[in-house]
């Protein structure tokens, strides 16, 4: 039986080879890189971290800042007598401007172009404040030289609400005969203490202020000085061994 009789026709053959076209898949195009410049992949360059150089003190400094420290009447004479010792470290070491305003009775401290340290204004204000509270100039000057020193103030009545003779006896226990108790606490705890009526001011490091405050509070609450001496010496020896 012939194929023509069944009505079926055979497919025609083309010899030119264009009957089938090979199509490349997109995946193979992405994976294969042709060196002759046919297909190329763009690789994103990693972003470089921004570089910010340190800013100098002149650019960082904004408008001039000022601090004012009020001086009570009973500290006018000591301030006048020690004025040379007070303004010399503020001007030479901290590069600040300082003056005493006679109208407002304030010590005014101001920054200027020569000021390098940002914290200089705070150090100078703490130095003046310590002197106004009653500390000696040499003791208060440690606030300028050292960064880890602080001032703490509290009232005797904050520890125990005492009145009249009871309050006077509590202050006397803190001071001791001829100031012996106060000097002992200062030497053991390496702090400086000022008793101003019912106010107590302590100058020292954080840990030493804590030791001195605990000893003074125990004296206010009625503990005998001998027991307080033993306690602070034990705490001081333990702290020295730890550090």
Curated annotation (Swiss-Prot):
Family listed: Belongs to the PNO1 family.
BP terms from Gene Ontology: ribosome biogenesis
Protein name, UniProt field: RNA-binding protein PNO1
SUPFAM superfamilies attached to this UniProt entry: Eukaryotic type KH-domain (KH-domain type I)
Molecular function terms, GO-annotated: RNA binding
Pfam families, A to Z: KH_KRR1_1st, KH_PNO1_2nd
Region Disordered: start-end pairs: 1-60
PANTHER family: RIBONUCLEASE Y, RNA-BINDING PROTEIN PNO1
Cleaved signal peptide residues: none
Main location: nucleus
Compositional bias of kind Basic and acidic residues: 11-21
InterPro entries: KH-I_PNO1_first (IPR055212), KH_dom (IPR004087), KH_dom_type_1_sf (IPR036612), KH_PNO1_2nd (IPR055211), KRR1-like_KH1 (IPR041174)
GO CC terms in record: nucleolus; nucleus
Residues of the KH domain: 164-216
Location relative to the cell: Nucleus, Nucleolus
Keyword line: Nucleus, RNA-binding
Gene: pno1
Task performed by this protein: Positively regulates dimethylation of two adjacent adenosines in the loop of a conserved hairpin near the 3'-end of 18S rRNA.
